[in-house]
A protein has these predicted regions:
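N-terminal functional module of multi-domain proteins
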Residues: 2-116
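Conserved small/polar residues in nucleotide/adenosyl-binding loops
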Residues: 118-125
Length: 129
């Protein structure tokens, strides 16, 4: 199945929903960057977030940059997404491996470290957490 971005509108435009299937995008990133499992999960989530966020922009040349910095062993994530559907990104340490968390899942939170995010739209920073 090809990657898809699906939009829906309900309640006379009062409700908008956007969903994405990005399996191929994430698999391509995994093979190109030789990512570990936890790095694949972290970058894949951020690539998908970039695609979802940029899909709500209006101008044809719109783009969004997501930079996630933490003090974890992953050493940060950077994603660039454009309205034309192109999405790219990388992680600072693609080979990081961690044991599963107590719930038996990939420990993406520990890999990234404490939260410090920045969202940039074009060249101007619109918001910061």
């Amino acid at each position: 199945m090809a990657d898809q971005l699906i939009r829906a509108v309900a309640a006379n435009g009062g409700i908008r929903v956007v969903g994405a299937v990005t399996t191929r995008l994430v698999e391509d990133a995994r093979t190109r960057h030789r990512l570990s499992y936890v790095a694949t999960a972290a970058l894949g989530r951020t690539l998908t977030a970039g695609a979802l966020l940029v899909s709500n922009m209006k101008r044809a040349d719109s783009r969004i940059n997501l930079q996630i910095k933490g003090n974890g062993p992953l050493d940060g994530i950077l994603v660039d997404a454009r309205l034309d559907g192109s999405v790219r990104g990388y992680v600072g340490n693609p080979s990081v491996e961690l044991p599963l968390n107590p719930q038996g899942k990939l420990d993406v939170g520990t890999a990234v470290g404490p939260r410090s995010e920045e969202r940039r739209v074009g060249k101007e920073c619109r918001s910061r957490w």
